[in-house]
Amino acid sequence: MDMQNENERLMVFEHARKVAEATYVKNPLDAENLTRWAGALLELSQFQTEPKQMILEAILKLGEALVIDPKKHDALWLIGNAHLSFGFLSSDQTEASDNFEKASQFFQLAVEEQPESELYRKSLTLASKAPELHTGGTAGPSSNSAKTMKQKKTSEFKYDVFGWVILASYVVAWISFANSQTPVSRQ
C-alpha cells in the first residue's frame, strides 16, 4: 500500500476509535460498540512501534463485550486474533504459548457459535500452527539449502498469515463501522 492509503486507514480507524469511545460514554453496555472499539484498536496497533499496549487495551474491551454477550461470535473471533497477534509479538516463549492457547480457545468458541464461518475455522487452524511458526519450526533436513528453503517457506507463510489476519480484522472492523453508521429511516 502506498503512504496515502496508509494515512487514510489510520484516519478511518482513529475516527472509529473516537466514535466508539464517545458511544461508550453514553452506553457502556453496548457489546457491538465495544467490539468495534477493539477492532479499531487492533487496526491502530499496526501503526504503533510498540503495539502490545494497544492490543492489550483491545483485549480488555473485548472482554467487556463478552461479559455483556458471551456468545458474540465476532468478539470471540476478534479476541482470538488479538491473542494471536500478541503471541507473535512476544519474545518470551511461555507468554507466546499462553496467548496462542487463548487464541485457540476463543477461535473454538467462535466456531461453535457460527460453525458455517470459514474464516473462524481457518483462524482456529492457524492458531494450532502458531507455536511452530513463532519458533520458526524445529524439524527439517540437515542440508543447509533445504533448511534455508524451509525457513524461507516458513517466513513466507508467517507473512501470509499476518496478511490474512490483518485483512480479516480490517473487514470485520469495516463492516462493524459501516453498520454503526447506517442512517436511521424515519417513517
From Swiss-Prot:
Gene Ontology biological process terms from the UniProt entry: protein insertion into mitochondrial outer membrane; protein targeting to mitochondrion
Record topological domains on the Cytoplasmic side: 1-160
Localization annotation: Mitochondrion outer membrane
Record has Cell inner membrane as a keyword: no
A Pfam entry, by short name: TOM20_plant
Topology feature Mitochondrial intermembrane, residues: 179-187
Summary of the tissues where the protein is detected: Expressed in roots, flowers, young cotyledons and leaves.
Residues where N-acetylmethionine is found: 1
Sequence intervals crossing the membrane: 161-178
Any one cellular-component term (Gene Ontology): plant-type vacuole
InterPro entries: TOM20_imprt_rcpt, TPR-like_helical_dom_sf
PTM characteristics: The N-terminus is blocked.
Membrane topology: Single-pass membrane protein
Keyword terms, alphabetized: Acetylation, Membrane, Mitochondrion, Mitochondrion outer membrane, Protein transport, TPR repeat, Transmembrane, Transmembrane helix, Transport
Disruption phenotype annotation: No visible phenotype. Triple mutants tom20-2-tom20-3-tom20-4 are vible but display a slightly delayed flowering time.
GO molecular function annotation: protein-transporting ATPase activity
TPR repeats: 84-117
Motif (AKR2A-binding sequence (ABS) required for mitochondrion outer membrane targeting): 179-187
Reported induction: Up-regulated after antimycin A or rotenone treatments.
Functional description taken from the UniProt entry: Central component of the receptor complex responsible for the recognition and translocation of cytosolically synthesized mitochondrial preproteins. Together with TOM22 functions as the transit peptide receptor at the surface of the mitochondrion outer membrane and facilitates the movement of preproteins into the translocation pore.
Similarity-based family: Belongs to the Tom20 family.
Other observations noted: There are four genes (TOM20-1, TOM20-2, TOM20-3 and TOM20-4) which encode mitochondrial import receptor subunits TOM20. In mammals and fungi, the transmembrane domain is located at the N-terminus while it is located at the C-terminus in plants. The overall orientation of the protein in the membrane is therefore inverted.
Assembly notes: Forms part of the preprotein translocase complex of the outer mitochondrial membrane (TOM complex) which consists of at least 6 different proteins (TOM5, TOM6, TOM7, TOM20, TOM22/TOM9 and TOM40). Interacts with a variety of mitochondrial precursor proteins. Interacts with AKR2A. Component of a mitochondrial large protein complex that contains, at least, MIC60, DGS1, TOM40, TOM20 proteins, and petC/RISP.
PANTHER family recorded: MITOCHONDRIAL IMPORT RECEPTOR SUBUNIT TOM20-1-RELATED
Protein name: Mitochondrial import receptor subunit TOM20-4
Species in which this protein is naturally found: Arabidopsis thaliana (Mouse-ear cress)
